[in-house]
Amino acid sequence: MDTANDKLERRLYSHDLAPLPKEMDVIFKTMPDQVVRPGYTEEVVQIVRKARAVNKPIVPRGAGTWGLGGSVPVKGGIVVDMTAMNKIITIDEKNMVVTTQPGITWKALGDALDAKGYFLPCYPSSAPSATLGGWIGTGGTGIGAYKYGSAGDIVRDLEVVLPTGVVVHTGDRYVPQNGGGPNLNWLFVGSEGILGIVTEVTMMILPKPEELRVVSYSFDDLKLFSPALKKIVRSGATPMHIMFSDRLHFEYLRAAGKEAPKVGCLITCALTGSKASVDVEEKILDEAIASAGGKKESKELAEHEWHERNYEFRLREMGFGAIPGEILVPVEKFDVVVEGTRKIVKDLKMKAPIIGTVADNNTVMLMPYYLTDEHKLVASTAAMGFAKRLGDLAFENGGRPVGLGVFFAGNLAKYRGKEGAALIRSLKDTIDPYGIMNPGKLVETGTRYGFSMPAFLMNFGMHMMGSVKRILPRDKMGEKEISAMKK
């Protein structure tokens, strides 16, 4: 088992996709006291038992590709880096399941399955870097979810080390867990690491389809996609994936020297199945898009966009930080939320491209992102007000942020209702009586001082960050590059 005590190395674990400025250490102790990298389940058990014996916080971590602070310490403690547990245990072709350690990336697993003629029904857009355990812990919905279901839907069994050091299996490897008590898989899917550490994952796999066809369509504006989207989800067509990006996203990409279309927005759909079924579904999509005034784009553009599906935040290559806001909203409210997002962006004097996916027949995931200098306190913390307002917009329209982490932990009652939130806290207290497993997340906003920040105070603070942003000068990040590109 590898252990890191060096200060510089520990600092690398004090942030995730959206780093906080060092000044936030006044509230949170984001630097771990130690980093350990176990190689197998027994080592995880040892870590947990030793941490419990000395009442030391434990923070499970995959690749840190989420942006809500779920894998970042708030009270120091031990970060358990699971990326060394990255082996495929078995690919069971007879039963069409795969069992792996949780630290393998989705891309590495997908490549191994592809070589044997299989594919993952669902995986994140961050597949090249995201780990199985991390994405399952956030309850991920991603590529393939529209047709095959989200992360939790494809999980058959999890091996989990509880905060007591006990190892449990949550499901049945070959059949769904539909009886014999509550489905324990779903107890841990989306739990954000507060109930235990996943050490083994068994998931369903599927034979590669006869055909995977990608088609792209454009509109003059993202809002104009709404009527077509409402037709598609009611049409009976089941694309594997539907993703969209607006004009500003492509302007930023071109400013970064990347190839990108000059359109108001682009919708890209992946279809899987037999050639005959794909032909039928493509025709349905063509008609739905045309009826709303959209235009079908070239096969070459569609294939280019599909190739780029795992690289949403190439803008970081321009040297900027990118703070993503991720929300889930009803399909019926798509145009309302797009307009609401633009109003937030305008009020906060920002520029924020809107990208996203259609998660299922009822749900859209919007992922507007904001360029910022993550090393400047005022600019970076003020941008958190953007995430707060975006989350509020989702709640107002029957949706929610994609997760809670540190920053939205005060919204648990909004998610689950007062009684539901109390039940989740009771489960946390029962499974983790000493409160050592990823403390300060989901059920509370913890601080370095050992007490939790009241929900109203955290929400008020994030709201005030947005108010600060409104009085700051208009953001100009990226404008120089875009202006140069337009000349």
Label the predicted regions.
Residues 1-49, 65-96, 249-257, 301-322, ...:
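N-terminal flexible segment immediately upstream of the FAD-binding catalytic core
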Residues 5-21, 207, 218, 224-389, ...:
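C-terminal substrate-recognition/cap domain of FAD-linked oxidoreductases
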Residues 35, 97, 216-218, 408-416:
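Conserved short loop/turn motifs at secondary-structure junctions
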Residues 62-65, 125, 247, 406:
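Short, ordered loop/turn segments at secondary-structure junctions
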Residues 87-243, 483-487:
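FAD-binding subdomain of flavoenzyme oxidoreductases
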Residues 408-487:
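Activity-critical C-terminal alpha-helical subdomain
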